[in-house]
Amino acid sequence: MMVLVALIAGASSSAFAQADLAKSKNCMACHAVGSKLVGPAYKDVAAKYAGQKDAEAKLVAKVIKGGAGVWGPVPMPANPQVSEAEAQSLVRWVLAQK
């Protein structure tokens, strides 16, 4: 039972760390977990890319380089302040949203 509690606590702490990283990199200025703002909700991104083998690599590139045309007319700006490791971590967190 203690191991399960520790695993749940660790997962929650990791999720909070990823949310904090998303805030610190200004992702949350345009995105939210459960609702569309300027950009799509993270839950919608996770649903759209579910089961796609190249989703992580595609989204990491989009986080860093920006992109347009996937979710409507508003382009996602490039984010050169986000490292590749940070982008991978953020994308994994986004893709885990349900």
Segments predicted by a language model, with ranges:
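Sequence/structural segment immediately N-terminal to covalent heme-attachment motifs in c-type
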Residues: 16-33
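Bacterial N-terminal signal peptides
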Residues: 2-11
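Axial heme c-ligation environment in periplasmic c-type cytochrome domains
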Residues: 29, 37-49, 62-91
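Domain-level signature for proteins that mediate thiol-based redox and metal-cofactor handling
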Residues: 16, 52, 56-57
